[in-house]
Structure formats: structure tokens, C-alpha cells
Amino acid sequence: MPIQVLPPQLANQIAAGEVVERPASVVKELVENSLDAGATRIDIDIERGGAKLIRIRDNGCGIKKDELALALARHATSKIASLDDLEAIISLGFRGEALASISSVSRLTLTSRTAEQQEAWQAYAEGRDMDVTVKPAAHPVGTTLEVLDLFYNTPARRKFLRTEKTEFNHIDEIIRRIALARFDVTINLSHNGKIVRQYRAVPEGGQKERRLGAICGTAFLEQALAIEWQHGDLTLRGWVADPNHTTPALAEIQYCYVNGRMMRDRLINHAIRQACEDKLGADQQPAFVLYLEIDPHQVDVNVHPAKHEVRFHQSRLVHDFIYQGVLSVLQQQLETPLPLDDEPQPAPRAIPENRVAAGRNHFAEPAVREPVAPRYSPAPASGSRPAASWPNAQPGYQKQQGEVYRQLLQTPAPMQKPKAPEPQEPALAANSQSFGRVLTIVHSDCALLERDGNISLLSLPVAERWLRQAQLTPGEVPVCAQPLLIPLRLKVSGEEKSALEKAQSALAELGIDFQSDAQHVTIRAVPLPLRQQNLQILIPELIGYLAKQSVFEPGNIAQWIARNLMSEHAQWSMAQAITLLADVERLCPQLVKTPPGGLLQSVDLHPAIKALKDE
């Protein structure tokens, strides 16, 4: 067979294979054209699931008479005229293929009128060469498209259509997605002459939650957490459902839009899933309705003819931006502050220095052994600093020290060896000590410990606070700063800016790097324990704290930060408790020897044992 140019109708039918998959695809393309025309009201009439009739009527700007024939021609569009337009596309349509493709596999009629015209005009294409016929018609300002007998001339495609109910459900889903994208447009959907959906336009500044509830249901609305997140040219808005109350029905609600265009993007879904993974089960999915706005030059929508895929030029930046935005609202809404005691508490009874836990102790390993899967890698400075010097910087510690030592004097002491210089002992002796063996978790945040037959309770949030303070407290080398992929920019007052400048050297030792200008401060790096925190909340609170101080000591700032960090765990597991105590015993050995108030409490089982024996 010789090479030849395909007839227009056949070429359009081939293109229709990508654009027109089913009746819902036709509805999507035509409704998007109405939105591009500036319509504020769109009426959609469907018969027999779209196989018999699809009628889209809008009140948009309409099409001029001399452009009607071009509207049905392939590769004809009013959206773009150059490559620059394509690279900065903001309209929903731009390929100029939809109407030509649809008209090649159906009987399509286009009726339109502009505000400048006295009468409307109707156009339709027919024949092998798709010749367009234009004639006068009666019609208000706007456009109506009628698609009759879809796939009438392509029986192979028609037989793949599903039942009327299934095809209409696909159309209904498309309209739901479009209605969520454009709250300012009234959309009415009818099937076989009956009104099925009525989505009324929401006035500017009005409550969008009413339409959100009508589309996604009251169950989603009750669990929806609003998101408002911005960085540079990136903006993320919308709602994500509370992961702690996600159900299989809610998990079906996953709507994402990029510059108003509905999308199915793996990168976006992965970022959202990653932000929610700590609160979702292995078989659960997050529920969300999110709107991403990005510079059109930074996203390529010309990936697939159906335009449901995009490519981001800086995909990693977009991924982390979405991840941080979703994680921020989840932490702000769901996490609770650590239970910290402001008042110094009496020191618990002294515990003998030489301890051996029953069974194999995960915490009493040699110093060279790495802890089991720590959440944070401690800064080298914390590990290399002499252990005896760190607790002395904590308020209230010295008051307890005297009492603890008096109690220790009453404890039988082992045989004394010749004294060695004090600085050489702590590191070796500390690692031979342990809080004990973790038996179980009590009340979700306390560890029940056993050592030499003695039982005690340890507060995991308080232990976590002391560990973070150790990780943040600088030693011989400043704490390692972790650059932020998206720097945090905040507006500050003159007093706050002055305090930040005075505290800059102290903050640098803690791994917090910032740059200030006239009225703003930009946080560029933070220490590792702060990376998973909601910096939008923590940093302003830290700035407020610094503004009230006259002296800026790194130790005091580290203590304040540790007390104000959100806990990583709403409910603790055995593995998490074991990992935490391993890190605490390695970095804070003094806590094992002289536990501060609120950390450890002995449990006396003798009365219970005696009562059992007396029965």
C-alpha cells in the first residue's frame, strides 16, 4: 500500500481514540470549553448514559459566525498562538482536537451567539471530508453543543460501552470533579429528563464548605482540615481528612487540581500519603481535596491528549512543598504538646549505680554499638561532650543533686579503687548503666521497666524531651545545621529582629541559620530534631521567647526548644520505647544515675504480693 494522506474524518477518528474514551470524556472536554469561555452557568443534559444524547449549554462569551467552521476543524483553537503561549498555558483546553474528534464519531451540532451578534448561528460537520455547514438559529448569548449517537459510525468502540448506569456514574464523577474546581460556576446535571445534581455557585468570599459537603458528603466535611500553605510561586489550598478517622468510603475522595486542572498525579499522591503515613494503616488511603497553584512555566500540561497528567520541572521541590503543607496542618490539628512540669518535683529515691537488668538488656551494650534504628541521628557534639557537664546547665537540677547525693551516701558502697581523674570516668561508667528492661507500654506514653526484680514507670514524653535537649545542646562542635529545601520567611517586629540579631551566634551553635532584612526573617537551616516539626508555629514562638530575654545562652534556648517540641508519637510502641531509652542512656547517662523529677517512679508491688499470699 502506498503512502497517502489520511482523509480528515479518519484522522479525526484516530485522534478520537485518545480523546474520546467514553461519554464522560466528551462531557469533560465540552464543559472545559464552556469554562474557558467564561461561563457562570452550565446545564448538562444526558440521555441513556450519554450514548444517545449529550447536551452542554452555557452562558459564556459565544463563538463568532466566521469562527464556527474553524471551531470544528482539527488543530484550530483560540487558546494559544505560539510556543510561549503553550509553555505558559492557563486555559483548560489548548490542543484544538476535541470538537473535531467528537464530531468524527458522533452527530455533533454547535449553536452559538456572541453579545455583539443579533442572531445565533449553528454549525455541523458531515461527510468524508468533514465539511462544515453553518445556518441561522435561535439561541441566547452563549453556546450549546449537542452530541447525538456517540460512536454510531465506529461499532467496535460502541460495543465497549458499559451499562447506562455505569456510563452515567462516570459522567457524574466528572461533574463532581469540575464542580470542586470551580466554586464560582453553577452546574446542573440531568439524566433522562430528571435533575440529578444542582451545584449552585458560591459568591466570592462565601462558604465553600456547603458545596464541598454536597459533593464529598458530610462525613468528609466533619473530618476536613483546611490547608493554606505558600512558598514563593507555590500555593497549596484545600482540605485533607483527619487520618485518624479515615474510612474506606472517605478514602475514595482523592481530588487534586493543578492551576484549576483536575489531575491524577503519582508525585502529588505520594507526597500526601507520606505526610499521613504515621497516622494511616497499611491498607488505608488519605482523603483530600487539594488545589496546587504554580507558575505555568514550571509545569508541562502537554503530556497526554486527555490532559490528566502533568510534569513538574522541579518535581522534588513540588513533592516536598506538598508534603510539608499537609504535614503542617496535621501536626497543628492533631498533635498535643508534651506534658511538661514547670515546677521542680522532688527527686525520686536513689538507685544503686551498678545495675544489671534481668535478661538481655538492649541498653547496656558497649559504647561502640549503634542504637537500634534511632529516629534522629544525634549530633556529634552531643555524643563527644563530657557527660558530667550537660545536666548541670538545667534549672532545678543542682537543687536536687545535693539531696540525691545524701541518699546515695546511705547506700552500701562497693569496694573503692584508687581514684582516677573525674573527667576520664563518666563515659565508660555511664554506658554500663541502664534504666532496665522494657516490659510493656502503659497508658500509651509510659514504659513499665524491670531491673533486678524492681518495677518502675518511666514517662516516655519526658525522656524524649531530655533526649532532644541533649541533641540540641552544643558541645565542642556546634550542632549540625540541616538546610531547609523551602526556607521559612516570617514577618517580625523591630524588637523581635533586634533580639534575633543578638541571639544569632547562640542560634548558630544550635544549628539554626537565618537571614534578616527590613521587616522579615528567613530561616534557612534548623537542627535535625526540628526538621519534622511545624516550623510555622514553632519558630514564631521561639522568636517571641527570645524577644523577652536579655541573655542568650545556647543551653537555655535548647531547653526552651525541647520543652516546646511536639512529640513524634501519639501512642508509643515497645520498639520506639527501647530505641528512645537506648539513645537517652547513651547521650544522658546522668539521668540513669540521678533521674530528675517527673521521669522515673518506682512501683511497689509488695502490698499486692502480700495481699495475694494472705488470701
Curated annotation (Swiss-Prot):
An example of a Gene Ontology cellular component annotation for this protein is: mismatch repair complex
Q: Which InterPro entries match?
A: DNA_mismatch_repair_CS, DNA_mismatch_repair_MutL, DNA_mismatch_S5_2-like, HATPase_C_sf, MutL/Mlh/PMS, MutL/Mlh/Pms-like, MutL_C, MutL_C_dimsub
Is DNA repair among the key words of this record? yes
Q: What is this protein called?
A: DNA mismatch repair protein MutL
Single GO BP term: mismatch repair
What does the protein in this record do? This protein is involved in the repair of mismatches in DNA. It is required for dam-dependent methyl-directed DNA mismatch repair. May act as a 'molecular matchmaker', a protein that promotes the formation of a stable complex between two or more DNA-binding proteins in an ATP-dependent manner without itself being part of a final effector complex.
Region annotation (Disordered) maps to: 362-397
Native organism is Escherichia coli O6:H1 (strain CFT073 / ATCC 700928 / UPEC)
